[in-house]
Amino acid sequence: MIEIQTVGTVQVLTLSSGRVNAQDVELLKELTGALGELQRSGAGALVVTGAGRAFSAGVDLNRVVEGGAGYTDRLIPALSEAFEAMFCYPGPTVAAI
């Protein structure tokens, strides 16, 4: 779901999940983990992009509807952790949309 490649001194993190990279618990946890690994490795500049025709459609609302309150109880913390990991990434970070 998350692909990372090095281009020169820049890390390129690509969301690659389904047709439109909709964010579900699994993608968000993988994103949080990948950002943590990059930070621990001392990586510098980061470009975040999406595979396919969309950067990201946002939260996967179909999964929210299907999973109900139990799914939402896991989604909100995963979303918060992913946002915090992105906001706290120490290097310059840009989104290639």
What label would you give each PLM region?
Residues 24, 72, 95-96:
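A generic secondary-structure micro-motif detector
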Residues 49-50, 97:
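Short beta-strand/turn micro-motifs composed of small residues
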Residues 83-97:
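Glycine-rich beta-to-alpha active-site loop
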Residues 50-85:
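Glycine- (often His-adjacent) and acidic-residue-rich active-site loop
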Residues 1-49, 84:
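Conserved CoA-thioester-binding segment of acyl-CoA-metabolizing enzymes
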